[in-house]
Amino acid sequence: MKDRYILAFETSCDETSVAVLKNDDELLSNVIASQIESHKRFGGVVPEVASRHHVEVITACIEEALAEAGITEEDVTAVAVTYGPGLVGALLVGLSAAKTFAWAHGLPLIPVNHMAGHLMAAQSVEPLEFPLLALLVSGGHTELVYVSEAGDYKIVGETRDDAVGEAYDKVGRVMGLTYPAGREIDELAHQGQDIYDFPRAMIKEDNLEFSFSGLKSAFINLHHNAEQKGESLSTEDLCASFQAAVMDILMAKTKKALEEYPVKTLVVAGGVAANKGLRERLAAEITDVKVIIPPLRLCGDNAGMIAYASVSEWNKENFAGWDLNAKPSLAFDTME
């Protein structure tokens, strides 16, 4: 049987990425052009800046992805692209590039949900057994998702306010840490002690919902009050206490979800899945089901994960028309 090559595009936020997947599971290339340095001075992603950067580098990313994969444009079988959720301007750049390539070569266009990409990146570790449960944690999302089969997603719990990654960046900004702050907070947390009593919102409530705004506010208030009084707080202890509260919330809700949905596999994915503290808690506390976490290179935004997620859509012949548009607020239950 002839090999299948999927060319995948990811431009939902501040990473321009193009990848090539051979058949179902052989990732031949995964080119990522990061914009972090451009956004650091603003303390967060500026949508217009992100869009301009995508336009500047996406052609080079396509060329590099094909060259690294050792194939030509004529070898590509299908084109996959993130169409949401994300920043509308950023999404449109990837969509325009993907549709142009697909149209020029007469190829099918596969629409992919960005968060499905994060989840299906676990396929790079080993073949996934369904049904499974997924904890998706990133800068824009905190969700528990039940996956009955590849491509069939149901959100069973999500944050009511801030995403966990968003909370990390906001408290990092208060402490004067470099954006994005997640990795630095994680490192500092391992050097400090959990001595500050931060709230664990909704941790005992009988649902699978998350809330991090109260924790964020409590952190900011403690830091602000100390500054007003001229008191010095240990950055390491602040980070350790904040991270302990976050992990307590994530673990409590995940354990409850596993009780309600008896599966054999838990996938933990998204940018925050790179967090060392989270990985340690998962290893220590989730022992009765298999826990699969994508490798670090596939935790952040990348086109490789979009390629993996596109396989189930290819198998279902879920192809999009040329009118496919960006859906910045796309949810799992509104996929094309």
Swiss-Prot record:
Example GO molecular function: iron ion binding
GO BP, sorted A to Z: tRNA threonylcarbamoyladenosine modification
Record-linked Pfam families: TsaD (PF00814)
PROSITE patterns the record matches: GLYCOPROTEASE
UniProt GO cellular component terms: cytoplasm
Location of the protein in the cell: Cytoplasm
Purpose: Required for the formation of a threonylcarbamoyl group on adenosine at position 37 (t(6)A37) in tRNAs that read codons beginning with adenine. Is involved in the transfer of the threonylcarbamoyl moiety of threonylcarbamoyl-AMP (TC-AMP) to the N6 group of A37, together with TsaE and TsaB. TsaD likely plays a direct catalytic role in this reaction.
Main location group: cytoplasm
Organism annotation: Streptococcus pneumoniae (strain Hungary19A-6)
Record text on cofactor binding: Binds 1 Fe(2+) ion per subunit.
Binding site for Fe cation: 114, 118, 301
E.C. number: 2.3.1.234
Cofactor dependence: Fe(2+)
InterPro entries: ATPase_NBD, Gcp-like_dom, KAE1/TsaD, Peptidase_M22_CS, TsaD
Superkingdom of origin: Bacteria
Catalytic activity: L-threonylcarbamoyladenylate + adenosine(37) in tRNA = N(6)-L-threonylcarbamoyladenosine(37) in tRNA + AMP + H(+)
Keywords: Acyltransferase, Cytoplasm, Iron, Metal-binding, Transferase, tRNA processing
Name of the protein this chain belongs to: tRNA N6-adenosine threonylcarbamoyltransferase
Protein family (similarity comment): Belongs to the KAE1 / TsaD family.
